[in-house]
Amino acid sequence: VRERGNDRRGATARTPLNRERVIRTAMAVADEKGAAALTMRAIAEPLGVEAMSLYHHVAGREEILDGMVDAVFGEIDLPPRDTDWKSAMRRRAFSARTVLRRHPWAIGLMDSRSQPGPATLRHHDALIGALRAAGFSVPMAAHAFSLIDSYLYGFVIQELSLPFSSSAQLEEVAGAILRDAPAGAYPHLTELATEHALKPGYDYADEFAFGLTLILDALHPDETAGPDRATPTPRPGRRSAGPGTGPAASSPQHHRAGRSAAG
């Protein structure tokens, strides 16, 4: 691997370049500048190498994106096995929200990859397994998985898009809107702002827990719970569950793969 410049010292002592460093550096670039800024040159620059050096460790940009998505899933806490299913789903959802806020580019990529890595598959399998062990049938587990993640992704997208990130900023933004609005034109919006959003202690992040609780309370296992529910047993004449089953079967990624196979 050729290092940039001729005046670097201690080159022999620097950390060797490998696939993990390439992936982590790409994530750092995306965290700062967004996924659109991810060129091989942009990734190579902070590593102090030429862009062509990256190809010794990754096949190209697509493999880097695959690795980034897998690393994100690897940062999310798996549903714990020593608690009830609602607590497990809640803990996993809060962990996922924290991780996705840390990597704002991730949501747009997470369901777009056709070659999921081991952390992604392990995450999905653990989530489905927790629901199955609690007594959710395969279809109901798929519905629950899809519903929870649709809410999770949507909330994070909205949260990251807000024009404020603190109470002071919210007061400034809302105050300007109310001042510029014609008197009495928007009574309900004014009421919500003055009687709720601008009250001391208000935090938009609290809305996440409220909505998640509503979703979890609306979901119910539809089969008998038990530890053996998490491990499917192949039936005679049928293939065991595998790719194409569970929540992933409802994702855009799955449908694109199915169309490709059919064509």
Regions found by a protein language model. Name each.
Residues 1-17, 187-196, 227-239, 243, ...:
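N-terminal intrinsically disordered/low-complexity leader segments
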Residues 21, 63, 91, 122, ...:
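Amphipathic alpha-helical interaction segments
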Residues 21, 25, 29-63, 67:
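Helix-turn-helix
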Residues 69-75:
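Short, basic, alpha-helical segments at the C-terminal edge of helix-turn-helix-like DNA-binding modules
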Residues 77-122, 138-141:
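Hydrophobic alpha-helical connector segments
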Residues 108-110, 164, 189, 201:
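Short, hydrophobic secondary-structure boundary micro-motifs
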Residues 123-147, 151, 155-178, 196, ...:
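Hydrophobic alpha-helical bundle segments that form small-molecule/ligand-binding pockets
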Residues 182-198, 203-214:
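Non-DNA-binding regulatory cores of transcription-related proteins
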